[in-house]
């Protein structure tokens, strides 16, 4: 059994020096709470370093994260009642970004208020826009001649 410095799970390189629970949080879409539930579901020690785990355990974790993660309780999943399929899903890595992009495109297409704000590049969540959040070059004020 050799120490693995980098372990690849769900298209993400994870640090083998971190404990299993904290290493799993390196995957986009898995936070600390989901990582803890995954570890408990598999019955693996979450404090063990990821690089020290045997190949069988790593394969077990990899299989669960990539295929069986939706067997977790629905309140833990990050995309409940998907607008396209109606199912409870848990998205990982690139799928999170892609789903977010599709949601924003859907809002823009239906001309919802949030979609209009996104399309114009304005703040979406009700923040004030008079003084903060300005983009582009700063234009100085020119003093008039006397």
UniProtKB/Swiss-Prot annotation:
Residues 119-146 are annotated as: Disordered. GO terms for biological process: translation. Coiled coil: none annotated. GO terms for cellular component: cytosol; small ribosomal subunit. PROSITE patterns: RIBOSOMAL_S13_1, RIBOSOMAL_S13_2. Keywords: Ribonucleoprotein, Ribosomal protein, RNA-binding, rRNA-binding. It comes from the Archaea. One of its GO terms (molecular function) is rRNA binding. InterPro entries: Rbsml_uS13_C, Ribosomal_uS13, Ribosomal_uS13-like_H2TH, Ribosomal_uS13_archaeal, Ribosomal_uS13_CS. It holds the Pfam family Ribosomal_S13. PANTHER family: 30S RIBOSOMAL PROTEIN S13/40S RIBOSOMAL PROTEIN S18, SMALL RIBOSOMAL SUBUNIT PROTEIN US13. Belongs to the universal ribosomal protein uS13 family. Part of the 30S ribosomal subunit. Forms a loose heterodimer with protein S19. Forms two bridges to the 50S subunit in the 70S ribosome. This is Small ribosomal subunit protein uS13. It comes from Archaeoglobus fulgidus (strain ATCC 49558 / DSM 4304 / JCM 9628 / NBRC 100126 / VC-16). The gene is rps13.
């Amino acid at each position: 059994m050799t120490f693995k410095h980098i372990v690849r799970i769900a298209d993400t390189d994870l640090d083998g020096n971190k404990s299993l629970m904290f290493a799993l949080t390196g995957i986009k879409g898995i936070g600390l709470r989901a990582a803890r539930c995954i570890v408990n579901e598999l019955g693996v020690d979450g404090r063990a370093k990821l690089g020290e785990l045997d190949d069988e355990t790593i394969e077990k974790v990899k299989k669960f994260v990539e295929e069986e993660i939706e067997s977790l309780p629905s309140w833990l999943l990050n995309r409940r009642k998907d607008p396209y399929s109606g199912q409870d899903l848990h998205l990982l890595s690139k799928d999170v970004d892609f789903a977010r992009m599709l949601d924003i495109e859907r809002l823009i297409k239906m001309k919802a208020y949030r979609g209009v704000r996104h399309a114009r590049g304005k703040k979406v969540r009700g923040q004030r826009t008079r003084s903060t959040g300005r983009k582009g070059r700063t234009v100085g004020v020119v003093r008039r001649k006397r």
